[in-house]
Regions:
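Disulfide-stabilized, aromatic/cysteine-rich ligand-recognition loop
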Residues: 2-62, 71, 78, 89, ...
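Functional-site microenvironments in short loops/helix caps that host divalent-cation chemistry
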Residues: 10, 114, 120, 124, ...
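Short glycine/threonine/proline-enriched tight-turn/helix- or strand-capping micro-motif at secondary-structure
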Residues: 93-100, 135-136, 241-247, 309-312, ...
Length: 339
């Protein structure tokens, strides 16, 4: 008996549409069930995690005294470990002194005499920032200013002698390869002020930095009134702080290096408006802390920020890779040191 093959009747267009609708609904239902299951799983995990955290965060009051003692012991141990790590890292005093030759130390530690007299401070240029205005005259007595920015090598002597925490860019408390003669950075205003006091000097006032660069003719940059990228390190033309002796062609008429560019310099002064200013700069942060003035612009800044009249500012607790400093002194201290 011959078998007759079964042939399924062709579905009508209406039946095909109905089946597609059923398949779509089935897929959506499965997807929703999966999402619901995942959500329940996450919620359960969250409840378990919150329970663990609650157990860790709470304890019986009867145990409080023992826990307080344990916390105190932890603080003592942490402080001890920090001191031990500081003692085992970085430079010893003798080692820091041997980073450079005697001649190099003498050159780096040299100061330049800035004679007494009047100079032009600030500017009336329309495009200048409000805190830079107005132009006015200031008279200063004779003072001395570091010829160079304070270098990593010089700061290493301070760190070694005082066991101060080194800049965060120093790996294991040591200066990165090839940066002995670069200006120290990642230092706060307080770090800079403490270094200056340790070395027997002080931070310069912003007027002292400006006069050392502008001289008596009110120039915009240490070499004159025309911007010249070959005379300073700014606007990423080097890409990092560089040797403090790299730009003799950018020195001021008194012989001070890097008053424009390389790193912005902390000053002793708070940011306050000049007398006669029509607009007041932001002189205080939201927390009531005052800003400190920085001068000179940096390797990261635009060329206009290196204008000698420009006033930058930051909180004294702030540190970055384009802030540094130099020191100043009065005449009497320097004369005594030379005798």
């Amino acid at each position: 008996m011959a078998l007759v093959p079964y042939r399924r009747a062709a579905l009508s267009a209406k039946e095909r549409q109905h089946r597609r609708r059923l398949l779509s609904m089935t897929f959506i239902t499965c997807l929703v069930l999966v999402m619901i299951g995942s959500t329940i799983h996450v919620v359960m995990l969250g409840r378990v995690r919150l329970g663990d955290m609650r157990n860790l965060a709470t304890y019986d009051l009867a145990e409080e005294s023992s826990r307080v003692r344990a916390a105190g012991e932890d603080l003592v141990l942490h402080r001890s470990h920090e001191e031990g790590r500081a003692a085992n890292a970085g430079y010893a005093v003798v080692e820091a002194q041997q980073l450079l030759s005697r001649e190099q130390w003498q050159d780096l530690d040299s100061m330049v005499r800035i004679p007494a007299g009047e100079f032009v401070m600030g500017t009336n240029l329309e495009r200048a920032d409000p805190q830079d205005k107005p132009e006015h005259k200031v008279a200063l007595p004779t003072y001395y200013l570091d010829k160079y920015l304070v270098t990593n090598a010089q700061y290493a002597r301070f760190v070694a002698a005082t066991r101060r925490r080194p800049p965060s860019t120093w790996k294991d408390g040591r200066i990165p390869q090839g940066e002995l003669m670069s200006p120290v950075t990642m230092v706060t205003w307080n770090d800079a002020a403490d270094y200056a006091a340790w070395i027997g000097k002080r931070l310069p006032g912003e007027a002292e930095l400006e006069k050392a660069g502008r001289g008596t003719d009110g120039r915009r940059w240490p070499w004159g009134n025309k911007m010249d990228p070959a005379r300073l390190n700014t606007y990423y033309n080097v890409g990092s702080p560089n040797n403090v002796m790299a730009y003799p062609q950018g020195a001021s008429i008194y012989g001070v290096f890097d008053l424009s560019g390389n790193v912005a310099e902390w000053t002793a002064d708070e940011l306050l408006p000049y007398n006669g200013a029509t607009e007041s700069p932001i002189a205080q942060g939201a927390s009531g802390r005052n800003f400190k003035v920085l001068r000179g612009g940096s390797w990261k800044g635009d060329p206009l920020s290196t204008s000698l009249y420009h006033r930058d500012y930051a909180f004294p607790s702030h540190a970055t890779d384009f802030y540094g400093f130099r020191c100043a002194s009065n005449v009497d201290r320097v004369v005594r040191a030379q005798n």
